[in-house]
């Protein structure tokens, strides 16, 4: 026999161990930093977000969760944080050609006008709370330090002493204070993010900078308080840390605090009291806290559209959800400062186009280029040697396109968009290869241009953007989990140039970049108001500044949809510092609480009442109207785009001097309700803006957003329906097997974390070999030598007789799943535990079990906080949560095993929205501990090696599997395989087994065991040698919990079949969805090789599946690196398992 190649298990184990050690080391370095461009339920600090680095081909089978139109191929920039850790891209040192600032060239928010009136922040202190900073950057500079609030370190120390602050260092005249509130004593790996954010707020680069234009923040002459905070000991501790930073910033004199980080979808109500008090303290002192809305788009993340049946798809979390904060969304203006390239067109005209480059091309050099299709095949690159490869976006990852071009001899890559009006995308750095991204329009021009040369210019210019004015697709939508209106306002956040570590500058994108601009504007506006309204208290000036800034914002209009972007996406609109500075009027709700109107639930007809405030000495005449709109629906999904319904007519109003007046606008959307309810059966938003002009033909003067919900928002379903109830076998995050819709595979050692996400009950499948070992006294499961493992599966699912790799839902005649357990302590289907995909945040989740009379026999502990499963991504959160506290092991309140019978397992929970009522979901669970009755004797034919049992097994539950197991030594591991019955019920026993190396092992009769399991998980195993002796099994030889000759004296109500145990019929197993009985496979007789894992001796340390180690409600602080370690670990185990499976399956088919 040919010697088979030995599988490198030892090498894999070494690689696995090394990987684990390295990842643990990296975990120690990075601590718990989770950035908002990698959205997380436990995320910490938001990093540049929407610069996608790879592309994926949409699955042709994806029917439930199509990709968003703007994100057709790329895996959104959830890898931006990883890119920050890669080798930096080469940048050409450009001598200073001008002392002009970036804002001199492009100022979409019109900050310069406000700076001229309020100064540039001299004498003011601003604070930035973030994950890390380069505290010695060249941009941290004061033009005139004699105007600074803190003239010296001694001044700072005096202020610290007054407020009992014993920590924090003076860095220089600009950075008056720096402290690490994380208390981990480590240097932040990510210094980019906080440095970039601080530069937008208060950067002040010197004229000697190597950049062509000088960075100047919104408040360049303000002093900085840099406060490092990141997750170290959990979210609650993290929130307390940034609360302490807020208090210190206020006490040290900060006028504004920027917080560009967040925890997606978390509710303000769940923050620690210390954090809420810190927000209130800042407000009382007139200190503005500005937060980023987040980069998590909406429910489903950036690659899925939310379902039209579930309108609560907002993901703005904390701290942005706090009412006292000013929460900022991101948009792209119609013009941008950008790198450029020039081409000579067919008519000999010079055409400039914007480019976003990674590893810049040599400036002012003419490059030849050649078209290379989508850069997938070798033939695409036949003409690119020594030239730039022009490649269309799509089909494969950007990095693969670049690598392919480099391999073909290209000197650079130009990738053009495959969709119109798309956003620029930062390409990955592949071996320092020059690469740049351009628009589709410019790419097609290059493709058709007869002169195939291009020149990259040294100096950036302001050019129109391909997208036009547009909300960033990554910017998080409201409402908040509490049901409040957020975000408040929008600012540019796409490709923003600012400072990064080591005296460098770079473009980053994200709401992180939008917030500090607004923070600077707020600081300047409050400075203006100190002079303009000296009699006001600081808190009154803060309140006025926030209302004026929101009122003067310009509502952004979607030219494609001919409607305004939703207030749940843009807030009040794009910030306009010039309008805010000049404003003498503003608009609020009728109670003068804020400059937004939350109507909560509305009917088809309702009214919007607002208050117009006039702070001038003259009466003001205005015209007003309201826009009415809702969500656009595409098929079964929200399109994340607005749908205009109608606009009211313009009306006239006069507001007396130094006074206010209310305006009421009647809305009637009844003519749209039939069509809208057909598209959104659970209700829909009716929203828009009440807009004011001094003349109907002139530009908008001010506006206020309003939001109402036509339906019952508070009582929308919080939980996705169970997967058992799905007609096509799919859920939002789960794509059904088209050939077997009821297939729900267990976890095993395969990493199904991104796959098994739906609402269901879980349980465990425990093989008889492990049950036997435990019964024989092995206390530590790691000491059990077996090729089989304990596996987490879904209640009501069963494998086939000869294939343990797939599980299928088995149903009763009424269609409900056959969820049955046998809580006898053997670890096999002993319990059920709840797993849910939550569509909304909820509170007070509890599981309880009711008997057939409706009496509660058991109640779980309460899970107080449940966060919606807004994404299915290892970098953020999974598409379902397993609740450890809901595990029911078949016992009552007193810890006694309940009687056999059918019970209702109920999960209760309440949405956290105002006015919500408790909801619940029920599952039927059968409990049955009845001992199996099996044959006590058998005969064996030596001629054909057939084993014939004296009788068929009997039980109160259908038989799941009846098999002959045999165990042999393969190297140092006992390996178990199974034999399925022949059509006549006999078993053909093999004479030998084959090892992984191809060696044969003779089998003795003592190697064989008869194993029977029913659908409740009761297992009995008997050595074949005992069957052949014709003797009844003794208790110590029998695998069941009781001796076969000592049947329990069951009362009628204790029998799961509804009959008394002494009158049990020969139960015929029910059939599963495939039309066959689970475990029964016709025309078998050959050995059915176990598909459990060859290397599970090493893997058994995990006991349960890898999936159960993922974050649960009791383990909410597991972060991205911990998930990465788990992925790597289970990947290696899965690889070994796959090799073993493949080998065994091939042998079985021989």
From Swiss-Prot:
It is an enzyme of class 3 (hydrolase). Residues 1034-1084 are annotated as: 3 X 17 AA tandem repeats. This is C5a peptidase. GO terms for molecular function: serine-type endopeptidase activity. It holds the Pfam family fn3_5. SUPFAM superfamilies: PA domain (SSF52025), Subtilisin-like (SSF52743). The lineage of its organism: Bacteria, Bacillati, Bacillota, Bacilli, Lactobacillales. Residues 1-31 form the signal peptide. The active site is at residues 130, 193, 512. The gene is scpA. Residues 1075-1089 have a biased composition (Polar residues).
